[in-house]
């Protein structure tokens, strides 16, 4: 894939583009991640689609914008990118924050032909259960400064609380959080503007979010990918019910063995569902 830049009205976006092998597919990563978050899916995607994997504003090598990290503002960047850089019907696949951005960008937008929502919250208050604590600790680590190695060690010591367990558990103690996984998170987190986390924590990032008005205006087919809420997934059962009520054309797949990370935890089941969904549209 070739890395490039795109100048939106309010921010410069860094992105990676694959060869024109099919339907344009824009990939939108989660908070404190970057375009490489989709690495495990890219070989299959690149062989089938014209892939554009973006760094959202404030992340990776994209530009910083003072007080400019509302999800709606990020979505405006994406809408401009699709209209000016691609210029033809485009599928969006967002994970976590990227999925919220995708929903905003798809609303009332005839240039979006399909939307994949990867374990995104619909109710920002859902962050309070676990992720507010994680993001608050990560925010403090970023403000403290230091090397990627220092940050990786710090991320490993972030404490989380699970229902029914009295003692806090450190991220490095959880299965799957190997040294390599923590180092990769540190690599992307250190390249994230800490203001993205602050605006998430104080909810100013979600100031314009109103699912009751946004979701009904998404006319394209939507695939909801839900992890298991008992395994730290953000998309709750009540949010799924809300989305299915409000979205004109929605499908839903639940992965009982996967948490919020979805494909970063296990690629194949997620890949299979995404390819099935997109194949039916072509």
Regions found by a protein language model. Give the residues of each.
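Alpha/beta-hydrolase fold catalytic core
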Residues: 1-25, 46-49, 86-88, 113, ...
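Conserved HGGG/HGGXW glycine-rich cap/lid loop of the alpha/beta-hydrolase fold
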Residues: 16-64
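Conserved alpha/beta-hydrolase catalytic His-Asp/Glu region
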Residues: 126-131, 148-216
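Flexible "cap/lid" loop of the alpha/beta hydrolase fold
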Residues: 115-154
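Catalytic histidine-centered segment of alpha/beta-hydrolase-like enzymes
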Residues: 258-267
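Active-site loop/oxyanion-hole signature of alpha/beta-hydrolase fold enzymes
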Residues: 53-97, 264, 272
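Conserved loop-alpha-helix segment in the C-terminal half of the alpha/beta-hydrolase fold
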Residues: 217-258
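Conserved hydrolase catalytic core segment
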Residues: 88-131
């Amino acid at each position: 894939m070739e890395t490039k830049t795109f100048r939106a009205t309010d921010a410069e976006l860094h992105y990676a583009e694959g060869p024109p092998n099919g339907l344009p597919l824009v990939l939108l990563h989660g908070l404190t991640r970057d375009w490489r978050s989709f690495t495990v899916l890219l070989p299959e995607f690149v062989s089938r689609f014209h892939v554009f994997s973006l760094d959202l504003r404030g992340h990776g090598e994209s530009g910083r914008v003072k007080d400019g990290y509302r999800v709606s503002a990020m979505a405006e960047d994406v809408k401009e990118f699709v209209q000016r850089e691609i210029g033809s019907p485009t599928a969006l696949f967002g994970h976590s924050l990227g999925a919220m951005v995708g929903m905003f960008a798809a609303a009332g937008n005839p240039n979006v032909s399909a939307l994949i929502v990867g374990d995104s919250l619909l109710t920002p208050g859902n962050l309070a259960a676990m992720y507010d604590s994680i993001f608050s600790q990560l925010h403090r680590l970023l403000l403290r400064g230091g090397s990627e190695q220092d940050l990786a060690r710090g991320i490993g010591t972030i404490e989380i609380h699970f229902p029914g367990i009295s003692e806090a558990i450190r991220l490095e103690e959880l299965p799957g959080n190997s040294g390599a996984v923590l180092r990769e998170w540190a690599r992307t987190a250190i390249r994230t503007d800490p203001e993205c986390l602050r605006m998430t924590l104080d909810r100013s990032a979600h100031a314009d979010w109103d699912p009751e008005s946004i979701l009904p205006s998404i006319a394209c087919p939507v695939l909801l990918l839900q992890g298991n809420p008992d395994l730290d997934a953000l998309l709750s059962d009540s949010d799924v019910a809300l989305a299915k009520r409000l979205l004109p054309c929605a499908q839903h797949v639940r992965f009982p063995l996967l948490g919020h990370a979805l494909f970063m935890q296990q690629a194949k089941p997620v890949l299979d569902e995404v390819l099935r969904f997109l194949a039916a549209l072509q």
